[in-house]
């Protein structure tokens, strides 16, 4: 029932309304605006790397692990609805705000008309620094799947096995479940969350991690090639999934996941081979520009 409905009923409308305003004002005092270039919340949201970020009434909500953020944007002015301490301690790194994306965009070969168009279209995308365990599960789910279904599967798992939380503005949400929460399940238990055959991948990985035979903390210290090789020891993790985890969780920006979209681009535009040497140290960011462009760009004019 809306607040207007409560007032019409005579059920102590002043107290209800004043409490709501007081709570809202208290929340919105913890907010500030940063000017950020090469940053677009909409582009990030639909870039296929994060599945718990949603547009809501002109702003975006992000759930990362057990954290919740509301954030909005007007041009280069980005408003974070949290305090400075939380921003500096978590969200600044999460959104990769210390990386010079202007320099990366400037490094794109001007003679490469396809890549110039892709980078221009996706210039607001950033590689998020997301939780390792969450990305392992998410990209296991991503196999032979599409973005809306992946999003639904992730949310189903969180609602079924994650801890219920409440944000500062009163919004209820579910944290991403820890490995221990999934390790005790039967291999087909996540079928109810619409994971299909991927259910056994997630449960077996959860058991291996919860049991201590796969060390997430050690993985975080490895270089790209070591990390990829270690990830490939997990049941259900292949080359593409390992590269996605390396890129979106470990921030190994030389990781270059190749799915159907990227393979088609490589075949069509880079028959002699993609110039990895030119983009060494940020090839994964270039890959994300290509992926975004293939999903959302106007390819007819390329």
Regions found by a protein language model. Name each.
Residues 25-302:
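HhH-family (HhH-GPD) DNA N-glycosylase catalytic core used in base-excision repair
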Residues 3-17, 24:
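N-terminal amphipathic/hydrophobic targeting modules at extreme N-termini
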């Amino acid at each position: 029932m809306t607040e207007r409905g409560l007032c019409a009923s005579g059920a102590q409308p002043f107290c209800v309304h004043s409490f709501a305003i007081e709570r809202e004002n208290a929340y919105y005092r913890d907010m500030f605006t940063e000017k950020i270039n090469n940053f677009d919340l909409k582009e990030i949201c639909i870039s296929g790397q994060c599945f718990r970020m949603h547009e809501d009434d002109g702003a975006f909500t992000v759930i990362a692990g057990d954290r919740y953020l509301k954030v909005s944007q007007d041009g280069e002015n980005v408003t974070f609805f949290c305090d400075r301490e939380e921003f500096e301690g978590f969200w600044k790194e999460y959104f990769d705000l210390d990386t010079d994306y202007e320099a990366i965009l400037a490094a794109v070969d001007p003679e490469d008309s396809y890549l110039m168009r892709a980078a221009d279209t996706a210039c607001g995308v950033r590689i998020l620094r997301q939780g390792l365990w969450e990305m392992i599960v998410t990209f296991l789910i991503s196999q032979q799947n599409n973005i809306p279904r992946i999003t639904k599967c992730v949310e189903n798992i969180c609602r079924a096995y994650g801890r219920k939380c409440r944000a500062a503005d009163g919004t209820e949400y579910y944290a991403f479940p820890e490995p221990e929460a999934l390790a005790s399940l039967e291999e087909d238990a996540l079928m109810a969350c619409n994971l299909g055959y991927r259910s056994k991948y997630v449960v077996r990985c959860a058991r291996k991690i919860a049991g201590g035979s796969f060390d997430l903390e050690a993985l975080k210290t490895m270089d790209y090639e070591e990390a990829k090789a270690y990830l490939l020891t997990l049941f259900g993790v292949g080359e593409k999934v390992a590269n996605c985890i390396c890129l979106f969780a470990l921030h190994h920006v030389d990781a270059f996941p190749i799915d159907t979209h990227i393979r088609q681009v490589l075949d069509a535009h880079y028959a002699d081979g993609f110039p990895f040497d030119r983009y060494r140290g940020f090839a994964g960011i270039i890959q994300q520009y290509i992926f975004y462009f293939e999903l959302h760009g106007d390819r007819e004019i390329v």
